[in-house]
Amino acid sequence: MANHKSALKRIKQTEKRTERNRHVRSTLRTFIKRVREAAAAKDAALAKEALAAAIPVIDTAASKGVIHSSNASRNISRLTKLVNTLG
């Protein structure tokens, strides 16, 4: 247990940020999963819609520091390539 006031504050801040990051990461995974499921179902129109919705979520997660910018770029690139193979 923390003994200093500043350490107690840091613990609270960490818990708050962890919860916020967990929510962003969960949302991110959900949107990525929607794109992959649409691609697996060979539904090009749905996959394109899902990709268009997923890209801003991925970029937001990167700008908030939840994921690295390279990770965001890699995800967007791979998902775009996947959707483009559907035609």
Curated annotation (Swiss-Prot):
InterPro entries named among the record's database cross-references: Ribosomal_bS20, Ribosomal_bS20_sf
Region (Disordered): 1-23
One Pfam family cited in the UniProt record for this chain: Ribosomal_S20p
One GO location term (cellular component): small ribosomal subunit
GO molecular function: small ribosomal subunit rRNA binding; structural constituent of ribosome
One GO term of the biological process aspect: translation
Bias type Basic residues, positions: 1-11
Keyword field contains rRNA-binding: yes
Keyword terms of this UniProt record: Ribonucleoprotein, Ribosomal protein, RNA-binding, rRNA-binding
Similarity comment text for this entry: Belongs to the bacterial ribosomal protein bS20 family.
Cited function: Binds directly to 16S ribosomal RNA.
UniProt xrefs under PANTHER family: 30S RIBOSOMAL PROTEIN S20, SMALL RIBOSOMAL SUBUNIT PROTEIN BS20C
Record protein name field: Small ribosomal subunit protein bS20
Organism from which the protein derives: Geotalea uraniireducens (strain Rf4)
Gene it is expressed from: rpsT
